[in-house]
Amino acid sequence: MIFLWKGANILYRHCTTEKTAAQQRLFERTLLEATHHQPYQDISVSQLCQLSGLSRKTFYRLFENKEDVLVALIDHTIMEYETFIGPSDSIGKNILNEPMNYFAYWRCHKQLLDILAKTNKTALLLERSVDHILREQREVRAHFGVDQEPYAEDALLFYVSGMMSLVIRWYQSDFARPESEMVELLNRLLYTPPVKHAKYISK
């Protein structure tokens, strides 16, 4: 196994075998299921091991701590968007072309959004979403030998961070608007000059 991502007090491992990948995902599902019955902060590593039927030794081969399980769950949820929408050359391309799917996907993952909101970790979802999209785009360009257009990553960063911010605000409103209205709002924000929104920003 090799380290997949390391940050402030966050470390989990990229699995190179089906067995370890399955164990990692089992811990993630167990954490998600456990939050049905008790707050995230009250769940211990020992509980995750007991509920999953896996040992503490296995846990610490895959994660440093419980928070890393949550980060892995976020990352893998982001990655599974590709499965939700079907095959494509680029996840970023689908987000740009099919925002309706993106909003629908995150409505389906309300439980994860609940955990992040209750633990004040919503910003982590935004950070991991942007990192994943940029990394995925770089890999696609490298694979096909495509040169990067000027400001391409800046534009993608602007779009994805804005779109995920809309998802978060939509969640905070308890998904008060249908997906179609969220897409309409997104289009207005994208194609209306910023000065048009100044009167709302100043209030």
Predicted regions mapped to residue ranges:
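C-terminal peripheral helix-coil segments that are non-catalytic and often amphipathic
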Residues: 2-9, 169-203
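Basic/polar phosphate-binding segments, predominantly the helix-turn-helix DNA-binding elements
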Residues: 2-5, 9-18, 26, 48-70, ...
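An amphipathic alpha-helix adjacent to DNA-recognition modules
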Residues: 21-32, 36, 41-45, 50-53, ...
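Hydrophobic recognition helices of helix-based DNA-binding modules
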Residues: 31, 73, 77, 81, ...
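Short, hydrophobic secondary-structure boundary micro-motifs
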Residues: 43-44, 114-116, 125, 179, ...
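Hydrophobic alpha-helical connector segments
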Residues: 85-114
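An amphipathic alpha-helical interaction segment
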Residues: 108, 157-169, 187-191
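Amphipathic alpha-helical packing segments from all-alpha helical-bundle domains
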Residues: 121-146, 150-161, 165, 195
